[in-house]
Amino acid sequence: MALRMLWAGQAKGILGGWGIICLVMSLLLQHPGVYSKCYFQAQAPCHYEGKYFTLGESWLRKDCFHCTCLHPVGVGCCDTSQHPIDFPAGCEVRQEAGTCQFSLVQKSDPRLPCKGGGPDPEWGSANTPVPGAPAPHSS
């Protein structure tokens, strides 16, 4: 119902400019699969690749950002991709061509998926402990 009011242009009087921004940004942040960064561009035009969008309409950019038109105040976008951040040193992240999906592959042979090894407390980019591994001893 609220979106129907937005699309009909009736919400401006009820919610005001900031109310519209808050409503649409809360909807963006609740979008399934959105667990990464979001940003807002004030006064940005609501068009992408030659197509124009109206208030409340959204589109998916080639760089995996889901954007929503907040006309006349701007555009809000959130990254929909989920990038692995903690993985064995012998692996690397690859984006699957033409999609917003990522996978872990072996550095030595990117055609093969990443193999998990035994527990290694030094494992990963964040140097986080492996679940179930013994705690390091302090000296």
Curated annotation (Swiss-Prot):
GO MF terms held by the record: CCR2 chemokine receptor binding; cytokine activity
The protein's location, in the record's own words, is: Secreted
Question: What are the entry keywords?
Answer: Chemotaxis, Cytokine, Disulfide bond, Inflammatory response, Secreted, Signal
Biological process according to GO: inflammatory response; lymphocyte chemotaxis; monocyte chemotaxis
* Tissue expr: Detected in prostate epithelium (at protein level). Detected in trachea and testis. Highly expressed in benign prostatic hyperplasia and in some prostate cancers, and can also be detected in breast tumor tissue.
Query: Which Gene3D superfamilies does the record associate with it?
Result: Beta-microseminoprotein (PSP94) domain (2.60.40.1900)
* UniProt region (Disordered), positions on chain: 108-139
Query: Which segment of the chain is annotated as a signal peptide?
Result: 1-35
Entry annotated with the keyword Disulfide bond: yes
Looking up InterPro entries in the UniProt record yields:
PSP94
Q: What are its GO cellular component terms?
A: cytoplasm; extracellular space
Q: Which cysteines are joined by disulfide bonds?
A: C38-C78, C46-C69, C64-C100, C67-C77, C91-C114
Keyword Iron present in the record's keywords: the answer is no
Q: What does this protein do?
A: Acts as a ligand for C-C chemokine receptor CCR2. Signals through binding and activation of CCR2 and induces a strong chemotactic response and mobilization of intracellular calcium ions. Exhibits a chemotactic activity for monocytes and lymphocytes but not neutrophils.
Which family is it part of? Answer: Belongs to the beta-microseminoprotein family.
| Protein name, as recorded | Prostate-associated microseminoprotein
Say which species the protein is native to: Homo sapiens (Human)
